[in-house]
């Protein structure tokens, strides 16, 4: 466990030196400020516009950070040949994968905190939400973090056997497809083809269901904009789904990485 945490710490240090990271955070803060301006132009809907665009900005920028940094976690080690030095040391391959993953998760957590503070400042400036509303914003941000943990696991998986370009493409495709799981399931229910129904059902359960964490869904927007609290059961269900899915993806990543020949 000590070696995993050491790798995670080094990964975090490497990530915070990445200029792309700061550019994306800056862009997210600009989008949040823009949502404040747009909210003032929509009479009667300032609060909803501010929260909607603010959460959307945090989600999308977080996704880009997860993919563009996640796809290089393993590839950079291979390209710089530092993986050979790590493997030569008393470091197991699964420890390298877990350490890289935890390091990026901590990076995402810090970035989410920065962007959330920016959104909170914008909300305070607008003066449209009470203290309870600020607290109810946190569950939505937590759901964003769960979705990013899942995206990071996918990016790490693809980085163990593919190039950065293909890894980014695969990760982004699954992120998009994962928001239409219900549509895929509905199509499988109405289609008359048994083969199509079977394929749709398989894909529905295999493709990650990002709709569980979607911040643009009506439920989450109501939690933040209209002060309707999320149920602990819903939060626990989303957390359990994320943990189980990420555990499966990381396990596959470890198996693939352990089978690679670096000689």
PLM regions with names:
Residues 1-22:
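Aromatic- and glycine-rich beta-strand/loop motifs that create alpha-glucan
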Residues 14, 75, 86-88, 155, ...:
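Helix-capping/transition residues at the boundaries of transmembrane alpha-helices
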Residues 23-27, 98-99, 170-173:
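Hydrophobic core positions of alpha-helical segments in small-molecule transporters
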Residues 29-73, 97-166, 200-201, 232-235:
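Secretory targeting signals
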Residues 42-44, 166, 170-255:
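Terminal transmembrane helical anchor/hairpin motif
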Residues 73-105, 257:
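Helix-loop-helix units of permease transmembrane domains in multi-pass membrane transporters
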Residues 166, 259-263:
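Short cytosolic juxtamembrane segments of multi-pass membrane proteins
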């Amino acid at each position: 466990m000590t070696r995993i945490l050491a790798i995670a710490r080094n990964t975090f240090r490497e990530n915070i030196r990445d200029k792309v990271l700061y550019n994306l955070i800056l862009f997210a803060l600009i989008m949040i400020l823009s949502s404040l301006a747009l909210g003032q132009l929509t009479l009667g809907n300032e609060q909803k516009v501010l929260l909607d665009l603010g959460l959307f900005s945090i989600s999308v920028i977080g996704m880009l950070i997860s993919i563009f940094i996640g796809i290089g976690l393993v590839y950079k080690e291979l390209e710089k040949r530092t993986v050979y030095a790590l493997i030569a040391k008393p470091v197991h391959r699964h420890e390298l994968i877990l350490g890289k993953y935890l390091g990026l998760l901590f990076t995402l957590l810090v970035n989410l905190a920065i962007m959330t503070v920016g959104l909170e400042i914008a909300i305070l400036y607008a003066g449209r939400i009470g203290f309870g509303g600020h607290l109810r914003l946190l569950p939505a941000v937590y759901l964003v973090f769960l979705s990013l943990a899942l995206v990071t696991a996918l990016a790490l998986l693809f980085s163990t056997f593919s190039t950065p370009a293909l890894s980014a493409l695969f990760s982004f495709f699954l992120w998009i497809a994962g928001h239409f799981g219900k549509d895929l399931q509905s199509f499988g229910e109405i289609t008359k083809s048994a083969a199509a129904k079977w394929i749709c059902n398989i894909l529905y359960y295999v493709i990650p269901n990002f709709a569980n964490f979607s911040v643009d869904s009506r439920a989450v927007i109501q939690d933040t904009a209209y002060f309707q609290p999320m149920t602990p059961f819903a939060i626990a269900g989303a957390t359990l789904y994320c943990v189980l899915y990420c555990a499966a993806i990381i396990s596959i990543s470890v198996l693939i990485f352990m089978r690679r020949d670096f000689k």
